[in-house]
């Protein structure tokens, strides 16, 4: 659903539609933050995360050094962007995501938690599921807080109260 796609992109990769697999602005920001000792922030795009998911499914070397892994992710992400449409990348990403440890993909997660297909999720439910990604085992309260924090920069009419209610309903 458009609400789900919007929620996922607002939390995971705001410039998804505009970059070619790597968001160099985010990469530069993360490097700058690391150099001055600020808190770590991620710079992986959805395409890079998908590249990582695909590589880890095939690679026996799960402990590849961090910088080497990132370079590999960049290469694979660029290849994905050359051969797949943005829609195909987003669909594969949503189908491979791990939610709450035991669930793979948005379809299974939506069915189990909301008892409906992803296309039937409303905006609040979509925001809650998107907020599960950084920490799938977080409490409903923490997930609602994360989803509310993401509202600040979004273009939605949702209120924090609506999100908290959806989190309580889906995750309790």
Question: Which ranges hold each PLM region?
Answer:
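Non-catalytic, structured segments within soluble enzyme domains
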Residues: 43, 47-172
């Amino acid at each position: 659903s458009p609400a789900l796609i919007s929620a996922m992109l607002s939390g995971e990769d705001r410039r998804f539609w505009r970059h070619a697999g790597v968001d160099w602005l985010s990469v530069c920001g993360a490097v700058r933050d690391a150099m001055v000792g600020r808190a770590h922030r991620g710079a992986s795009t959805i395409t890079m995360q998908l590249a990582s998911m695909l590589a880890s499914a095939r690679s026996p070397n799960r402990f590849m050094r961090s910088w080497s892994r990132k370079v590999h992710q960049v290469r694979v992400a660029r290849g994905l962007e050359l051969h797949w449409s943005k829609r195909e990348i987003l669909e594969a990403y949503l189908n491979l995501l791990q939610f709450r440890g035991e669930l793979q993909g948005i379809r299974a997660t939506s069915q189990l938690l909301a008892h409906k297909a992803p296309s039937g999720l409303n905006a609040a439910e979509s925001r809650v599921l998107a907020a599960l990604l950084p920490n799938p085992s977080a409490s409903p309260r923490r997930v609602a807080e994360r989803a509310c924090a993401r509202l600040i920069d979004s273009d939605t009419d949702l209120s924090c109260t609506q999100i908290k209610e959806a989190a309580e309903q889906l995750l309790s």
